[in-house]
C-alpha cells in the first residue's frame, strides 16, 4: 500500500510518500510545496492544489493522510492551516482517494508512543522507522512522513481489531 502524508500550511506544505508491505515501511519520496509568501491566500491555495495534484498523479498513492490543524492560542493560524487542509482534501477527493485526518497528538502517539513527544523526537522516529541516515528535510516533509507512518500504524491496529486477534 502506498500512503501520501500531508502536513498542510499556507506558507509550506510538506508531503511524504511511504510504501508498506508486511509491516515494513519504505520511503518513496518527500518534499514540500512553497507558494510565494507575498501572494494572496487564494493564489497560494491554488498553487498548493496544483502541486498536490501533481504529487498524486506522479506517486499514485492508495490512500492519503492529512494532519488536522491544532488551534491552541493562535486561532488565525489554525484557520489558515484549515484552508490548506481543505485544499489537500479536495485534491485527494478529486482523485477518488480515501482520506483520513489525524490530530497532532494522535500522530505523536502513533509515531513516538507519546502524545506529548517533541518535534525532534518525532523526526528522529521518522528517521529510525524509515531506516534513513538523516532526518528528512525540510521539517515539513519529515512531519508529513510522520502523518503517513501514523496512518499505517492506525490501519494495522484497525486490522488487528477487526480480525479479533488481540493476543
Curated annotation (Swiss-Prot):
<keyword id="KW-0479">Metal-binding</keyword>
<keyword id="KW-0540">Nuclease</keyword>
<keyword id="KW-0460">Magnesium</keyword>
<dbReference type="Pfam" id="PF02075">
    <property type="entry name" value="RuvC"/>
</dbReference>
<keyword id="KW-0255">Endonuclease</keyword>
<feature type="active site">
    <location>
        <position position="7"/>
    </location>
</feature>
<feature type="active site">
    <location>
        <position position="67"/>
    </location>
</feature>
<keyword id="KW-0963">Cytoplasm</keyword>
<keyword id="KW-0238">DNA-binding</keyword>
<dbReference type="InterPro" id="IPR020563">
    <property type="entry name" value="X-over_junc_endoDNase_Mg_BS"/>
</dbReference>
<dbReference type="GO" id="GO:0005737">
    <property type="term" value="C:cytoplasm"/>
</dbReference>
<keyword id="KW-0378">Hydrolase</keyword>
<dbReference type="GO" id="GO:0006281">
    <property type="term" value="P:DNA repair"/>
</dbReference>
<dbReference type="GO" id="GO:0000287">
    <property type="term" value="F:magnesium ion binding"/>
</dbReference>
<dbReference type="InterPro" id="IPR012337">
    <property type="entry name" value="RNaseH-like_sf"/>
</dbReference>
<comment type="similarity">
    <text>Belongs to the RuvC family.</text>
</comment>
<protein>
    <recommendedName>
        <fullName>Crossover junction endodeoxyribonuclease RuvC</fullName>
        <ecNumber>3.1.21.10</ecNumber>
    </recommendedName>
</protein>
<feature type="binding site">
    <location>
        <position position="140"/>
    </location>
    <ligand>
        <name>Mg(2+) 1</name>
    </ligand>
</feature>
<keyword id="KW-0233">DNA recombination</keyword>
<keyword id="KW-0227">DNA damage</keyword>
<dbReference type="GO" id="GO:0006310">
    <property type="term" value="P:DNA recombination"/>
</dbReference>
<dbReference type="GO" id="GO:0048476">
    <property type="term" value="C:Holliday junction resolvase complex"/>
</dbReference>
<feature type="active site">
    <location>
        <position position="140"/>
    </location>
</feature>
<keyword id="KW-0234">DNA repair</keyword>
<dbReference type="InterPro" id="IPR036397">
    <property type="entry name" value="RNaseH_sf"/>
</dbReference>
<feature type="binding site">
    <location>
        <position position="67"/>
    </location>
    <ligand>
        <name>Mg(2+) 2</name>
    </ligand>
</feature>
<feature type="binding site">
    <location>
        <position position="7"/>
    </location>
    <ligand>
        <name>Mg(2+) 1</name>
    </ligand>
</feature>
<dbReference type="GO" id="GO:0003677">
    <property type="term" value="F:DNA binding"/>
</dbReference>
<comment type="subunit">
    <text>Homodimer which binds Holliday junction (HJ) DNA. The HJ becomes 2-fold symmetrical on binding to RuvC with unstacked arms; it has a different conformation from HJ DNA in complex with RuvA. In the full resolvosome a probable DNA-RuvA(4)-RuvB(12)-RuvC(2) complex forms which resolves the HJ.</text>
</comment>
<dbReference type="InterPro" id="IPR002176">
    <property type="entry name" value="X-over_junc_endoDNase_RuvC"/>
</dbReference>
<dbReference type="GO" id="GO:0008821">
    <property type="term" value="F:crossover junction DNA endonuclease activity"/>
</dbReference>
<comment type="function">
    <text>The RuvA-RuvB-RuvC complex processes Holliday junction (HJ) DNA during genetic recombination and DNA repair. Endonuclease that resolves HJ intermediates. Cleaves cruciform DNA by making single-stranded nicks across the HJ at symmetrical positions within the homologous arms, yielding a 5'-phosphate and a 3'-hydroxyl group; requires a central core of homology in the junction. The consensus cleavage sequence is 5'-(A/T)TT(C/G)-3'. Cleavage occurs on the 3'-side of the TT dinucleotide at the point of strand exchange.</text>
</comment>
Amino acid at each position: 500500500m502506498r500512503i501520501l502524508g500531508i502536513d498542510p500550511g499556507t506558507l509550506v506544505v510538506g508531503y511524504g510518500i511511504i510504501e508498506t508491505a508486511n509491516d515494513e515501511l519504505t520511503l518513496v519520496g518527500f518534499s514540500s510545496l512553497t507558494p510565494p509568501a507575498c501572494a494572496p491566500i487564494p493564489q497560494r491555495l491554488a498553487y498548493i492544489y496544483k502541486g498536490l495534484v501533481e504529487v498524486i498523479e506522479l506517486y499514485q498513492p492508495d490512500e492519503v493522510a492529512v494532519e488536522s490543524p491544532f488551534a491552541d492560542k493562535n486561532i488565525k493560524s489554525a484557520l489558515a492551516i484549515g484552508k490548506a487542509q481543505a485544499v489537500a482534501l479536495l485534491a485527494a477527493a478529486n482523485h477518488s482517494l480515501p482520506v483520513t485526518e489525524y490530530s497532532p497528538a494522535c500522530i505523536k502517539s502513533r509515531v513516538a508512543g507519546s502524545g506529548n513527544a517533541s518535534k525532534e523526537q518525532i523526526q528522529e522516529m521518522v528517521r529510525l522507522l524509515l531506516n534513513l541516515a538523516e532526518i528528512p528535510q525540510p521539517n515539513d516533509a519529515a512531519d508529513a512522513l510522520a502523518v503517513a507512518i501514523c496512518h499505517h500504524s492506525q490501519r494495522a491496529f484497525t486490522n488487528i481489531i477487526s480480525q479479533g486477534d488481540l493476543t
